[in-house]
C-alpha cells in the first residue's frame, strides 16, 4: 500500500483536481456558447421558440419593469464594518412570443436597462421607438423556485394573467447574461490543468515504479 501512495504525485493530483473543478463549472456554459445564437428580436416576436439551454444574443428591443432585485454588501471582519447594500442585479420582464420570460441584468447595464424600460412604456403610450441599446449575450435557464414565484406574482398583479394562463406558458424561463469568452478561457485552462496533472501523475508513477523494480531485482 505504501508503494502505491509513493507512486502518486500530490502535485499531479492537485493540478488535475483544479482542472476538473474548472471544467465542471465552465463546460455547460461553454457548450451553450457554441450554439447558434437566437436574437432577442426574433424571440420577442415569436419567430423562434425559446427553450432552456438556448443561446440568445443581441440588442434587447423592449423591456418591462423588474420583478426582483439582488443586493449585496461586503463585511470587513478586521474592523467589524459592513458596506451599505448595493444593487448587483435586477430581473426584468420581457414579452417572448405568446409568453413572458425573465431577463437578468447585471449592475454594469442597469442604467441602460432602466432607460429601456422607460422608453418601452413611452412607446406603448404612443411615443417613439426605444433608443436605449441594451446588448446582452445570454443562456436560457429555468427559473429557480424563488424567482419563479415572484415572477408569477408579477404576471398576476401587473399583467392580469390568470394562474391557468401562467401554467400554460410552461416552464418559466430566465435569460441570464454570461461572459462566454471568459468562460471558454476557463474551460481551456481547466483542460490544460487536467492534462498537465495527468502527465505529472504518469511520470511520477513510471519513475517510482522503475526504482521499485530495480530494488526488487537487486534483492
Regions found by a protein language model. Give the residues of each.
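Hydrophobic secretory-pathway targeting helix
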Residues: 1-40, 183-204
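Short, aromatic- and cysteine-enriched interfacial helices/patches
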Residues: 1-5, 124, 171
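Alpha-helical transmembrane signal-anchor/signal-peptide segments
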Residues: 27-51, 171-175
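Membrane-proximal low-complexity regions enriched in glycine and acidic/polar residues
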Residues: 44-137
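Short, low-complexity, polar/charged sequence segments that are solvent-exposed and flexible
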Residues: 77-81, 155-160, 191-195
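Extended, charge-rich, solvent-exposed interface segments
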Residues: 109-123, 169-203
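Extended, hydrophilic extramembrane loops/domains of integral membrane proteins
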Residues: 125-176
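Cytoplasmic C-terminal tails of single-pass
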Residues: 209-219
